[in-house]
Amino acid sequence: PVPDSSFLRDP
């Protein structure tokens, strides 16, 4: 499954 890409976004 595709991992959550939320960590790719800047804070």
Swiss-Prot record:
GO annotation, biological process: neuropeptide signaling pathway
Keywords, sorted A to Z: Neuropeptide, Secreted
Entry's transmembrane regions: none
Biological function: FMRFamides and FMRFamide-like peptides are neuropeptides.
GO cellular component: extracellular region
Entry similarity comment: Belongs to the FARP (FMRF amide related peptide) family.
Protein species of origin: Striatophasma naukluftense
Name used for this protein in its record: Extended FMRFamide-10
Subcellular compartments: Secreted
